[in-house]
Regions:
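N-terminal export/assembly segments and adjacent metallocofactor-ligating motifs
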Residues: 1-179
Length: 179
């Protein structure tokens, strides 16, 4: 089992290397949308890990987009950690006039409070447009956003149903088939 010590990579992003599958998506996104590369894959083989160069913090204007492209949750939003479960929040498409990015986002709300802000994703769950850190981390007030409407999800999505009360038609356990 691979275990890693926690590493602080910035004021807004938490890295959990124990979850990382070394897909390099965060490294590629940071390299493509920013001018300076401050993190990458360190060491070789079984000792490989994602880290910043000489323990510098990742502080560029679009660094939060690495959270959206991480497929396993190894990079998480420090401003949203342990606030609530994702399936308790309702996603809404929203936008704002931002001089740095497009401002088109999905805001995740619990009641009237914005819990987190993410980039909009298409039907393949890929980020449509990257958003700046100002939109993602700094603007958590409802007055900062123009709400366009609720976000559409697949009919069987836990987030769309927002509960676990739907009864199953039939439950079959075929233990003899697996013995």
């Amino acid at each position: 089992k691979r275990t890693f010590e926690p590493e602080d990579i910035g004021p807004n992003i938490q890295l959990h290397m124990n979850r990382c599958i070394l897909c390099y998506r965060c490294v590629m996104v940071a390299d493509q949308i920013t001018d300076n590369r401050v993190h990458g894959v360190m060491d070789r083989g079984d000792h490989s890990n994602i880290s910043t160069c000489i323990s510098h913090a990742i502080d560029n204007e679009f660094s939060g987009n690495m959270i959206d492209v991480c497929p396993v949750g190894a990079l998480t939003d420090k401003t949203f950690r342990f606030k609530s479960r994702v399936w308790f929040n309702k996603p809404y498409d929203a936008h704002r006039d931002c001089p740095t990015c497009s401002g088109k986002t999905t805001v995740w709300m619990f009641g009237d409070e914005i819990q987190r802000v993410t980039g909009r994703k298409d039907e393949f769950h890929e980020v449509e447009e990257f958003i700046c850190n100002g939109c993602r981390f700094d603007h958590k007030e409802l007055a900062d956003w123009t709400i366009e409407g609720p976000r559409a999800f697949d009919k069987d999505s836990v987030i769309n149903q927002n509960n676990y009360t739907r009864k199953l038609d039939k439950v079959e356990i075929a233990t003899e088939d697996h013995i």
